[in-house]
Amino acid sequence: MVSRLSKRYRSRVQFSISVMDENIYLSLSQINKDIRKENKSVRNRLQSILLDNKFLQDRVIPIFPHYPLIPNERCGLWYCNPSSFKQTSYFKSTDGHVNQWDFSTRRLNFHLLETIRDNKGIIIVDSTRRGKKIPDALSKTVPIWCAVLNTLMLQETEKNVAIDKVLYLPPETVPKSEYDMIKRKIPELVAKLQKLNIIDSKKLNELFMGKLLRPIWVHPGSSLLDHSVDYFTGEVQEYEAWETPEDQNIIPIILCTVSYQAQDGMDKRYGFTYVQGAADDHELWSFGLDSNMFWAHIEYLGDASYSDDQLHDYIMDLAAAKLRNQCYIQDKGSLDEVFGNIDKITNEISLGKVSSGLTINKNLKQKLKSEYGKVIIFSNSVTVAEDTDDEEESGTDPFISIYKLQSGDKKSSKALRSTFPRIHGEIQSLFTNRDEKIKPMLICCNTGTDMSIGVILSILCTKYTEEWMLTSELPDISKLIVRKHLTKLISHLKGRNVNPSRATLNSVNSFLM
């Protein structure tokens, strides 16, 4: 009897526990669902970005008032009003990941060198998602970049450069074991840069007067940003601008992380749910809003009283207005307005950026014909308006060639390699009969930094010397030659962050070699 009762009791207890476990699971599942919903909330994201911007404006800039802001693309752009900066950087966190430490020859960021010299320092702005205090781009990628340049510069006067003297990493973020591994990697990365033959020890010494690039990290909670309090009155004292110590032969590179560490869905102190690194992967939550649109309409989008639905409707209206404006520009605007500030690469090649959804009408086509002998566009949404009166377009070699390939898409980048023979066949006439005055070609993609760059690289490697002089002989081509042309292209396009994807460069190499 007792045995039967104990069995019945145990079965009831087990049933109760299983029901309780299921309820706990359902509760946790609902909590996770709510957190994901709050993380995707446009209102929470935009308010979090503004809170982080307030940290930048109130705590960082007063300490370093003389250094220009350099938002690190893409995330950093959201935290800086476009009126507050003139340049951006592109340091990727992947170049700082464990066992992937690198000095990228695709992302040299050499357009910053003169800015660093002229202002005796810069502030690079970025953010990071939950779990980290500093993104890898700021804790390792930029410091490695600085260490490589420091080492190369010191080789002008020192035979054996002590890497400890030039490599600085945040000890609270990067363990000593990883520091040692990165230190051993630096000579290899210096040699990699030297092979490109684009900058040497002498030039770096002239630029920085022998001063080392010294990363300095700031983030919410940094002791460097602590304000002083009057001991008697309790009043917060005004911030004093930081000065480079006279005994330090350095140029400060301020690496600013604007977001603070917070567990998802937990911080609701400010009337919204704070999202750490809110601007990251904006395509997943912004409904087409970009950083420029955000700051241009900050009065409405920054108003915390509006709901997600109201913000969504407003963003949809902005997108519609942007499309109407594009239609007006393509009809009435200049070619620079339509194709994003066209850059001249050589006398024969120009680079542009084409807007998604553009329809090239007869008026725009005539403008293009007045300036160019050939237009090549990579986009899956750009079209040419049908024009039955234009008999010139009925030939086999049309003036405008549109390839339905999209920058930023790996499949498109891979498909590029099979497209190269056709492209080079189309442009051949522009490089023959050079005695005749032939108009240059315009090459565009939807970013102006990826597929169009790949095509231009293939042309530079096959039609030009390393000094970009036209040649009728096919130059010797190797991966090093491709990198040299890319490096020169990056230096030439100071106002544009050139960043062809690995897949695009693989297609270029496959075609050329």
UniProtKB/Swiss-Prot annotation:
Highest taxon above the source species: Eukaryota
InterPro entries assigned to the protein according to its UniProt record, in alphabetical order: Rit1, Rit1_DUSP-like, Rit1_N
BP term (GO), one: charged-tRNA amino acid modification
Listed GO MF terms: pentosyltransferase activity; tRNA adenosine(64)-2'-O-ribosylphosphate transferase activity
GO cellular component: cytoplasm
Keywords of the record: Glycosyltransferase, Transferase, tRNA processing
One Pfam family linked to the record: Init_tRNA_PT
Assigned EC number: 2.4.2.-
Further details from the record: Present with 259 molecules/cell in log phase SD medium.
Its biological purpose: tRNA backbone modifying enzyme that mediates initiator/ elongator tRNA discrimination. This enzyme modifies exclusively the initiator tRNA in position 64 using 5'-phosphoribosyl-1'-pyrophosphate as the modification donor. Recognize the stem-loop IV region that is unique in eukaryotic cytoplasmic initiator tRNAs.
Protein's name according to its UniProt entry: tRNA A64-2'-O-ribosylphosphate transferase
Organism: Saccharomyces cerevisiae (strain ATCC 204508 / S288c)
